[in-house]
Amino acid sequence: MRLAVLAPLLATASACRLPAAVSPVRPPSSASSIRLPPATTDRTLSPLEAALLLAFRWQTQQQTGVHSDEPGFHGMLSELREYQREHTTQEQADASLRIMASLAGPFPSLFRPFAGEPWAPSALAWCTTKFLGFLVGATRLTQRRAGDPRGGGVLVEKCAVLEHGGCKGLCIHMCKLPTERMFAEQWGMPVHMAPNFETCECQLSFGVVPPPVEEDATLPTGCLGSCPLARDGAPSLDAFRDFT
């Protein structure tokens, strides 16, 4: 029965002629030289995306205890920034993990028995393109990673959270690290997320074990030069300078 449910996903994933994955980019050694341009992407959501954002934001409020009167996507970013100011990077990652786990429901346990199947990375990549747009914007399927023609890759063309949030700490501690941990521990599927802090692209590679964060060449040290929290002198600013 479960395989019958997954059949449309598998057929779609296997039939695609996938473009190559984006190669990881080694950023400047110091993130302070990176200044993101002003956000330009229009956050117009479909009814489904609006409903998903509402559910995500409600869970964010429940797990962080932070509430903003600002509506929609930007209100959610305001809540996450406020939580960052007062909590350690570990607390930020733990809160994000709880948010994602609560929204995933029973699906990780349903998927986990099939995590070792050759089609599993492609199936997760396909699902990601259908259900993640409300949070990050436009996505497209790619090969798993540069030089690997298998399916299982997703390119976030311009991550809305990074573009509008402008914070490396938000990207790493409340998205990249908890997402990689959640898929490995709960779904039984490794995934490597490789953000590009100059273009706001992010390459997801399902079925690829991420390197230790201190060895990840895609992550510069320090705060982005355009980070709003760095400009404001947030109390927890120093925590953003480290990856652990």
Identify the meaning behind each predicted range.
Residues M1-P24:
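N-terminal chloroplast transit peptides
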Residues L6-L9, G147, P195:
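Sterically constrained small-residue positions within well-ordered secondary structures
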Residues L18-L155, A160-H173, R181, H192-M193, ...:
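N-terminal accessory segment detector
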Residues W187-V191:
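Low-complexity, intrinsically disordered Gly/Pro/Thr-rich segments
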Residues N196-G207:
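Beta-rich nucleic-acid/ligand-interaction surfaces
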